[in-house]
Amino acid sequence: SIAKPCVNLPSFYLGAVTISSQQQANSALTLALKAEARALGFSACGIAPADATPEAAARLDAWLAEGMHGDMLWMEERAGQRGSPRALWPAVKSVVMLGMSYAPAGDPLALADVRDRGRISVYAQGQDYHDIVKKALKALARWLVSRSPCDLKVFVDTAPVMEKPLAAAAGIGWQGKHSNLVSRTDGSWLFLGAIMTTLDLPPDAPHADRCGSCTA
């Protein structure tokens, strides 16, 4: 037989898709990133491209026009930035969405009829989630920069970021009729955080809307 010359190429051919060495590296980085997120206490991690929610701005404008924001004037004041990740930070390419479960160990309604016990929302029974989630986000951000130098920003609830549509676009869950994100594994018991980065990471598939016919 005649030996064929060996040619080093920057990519390999798989089926009908050519995958570059950079894409291979980013895919491996993404898998490691998700494993690190789990190690830091996050129960969900997904990635969405920065332009994954083009309909969010229009929905926000309609919501504001109906006065649904009530006294939350800051929602209107920064609506332009809130509508899109790139409106907030033009350099962003990918958004890493993260969810940290705060599901209670028992049934929170079990004490509903106990009159000598106060009722405190489950999310408020522990430490301030802003501090807990942001600490984990910063740790994950440091890990990411150490593996692949990039610019990034972390967010948890206090910046003009539409976390729920982005989390749905990142495959973590879907936005239910009650407006909250619903995860098939964690329900609505998720604190959401985001890391915007200049890295072009492979995105996850958006989560389908699985709401039924309820009118709640």
What are these regions (language model features)?
Residues T215:
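TRNA-recognition modules of translation machinery and tRNA-sensing kinases, especially anticodon-binding
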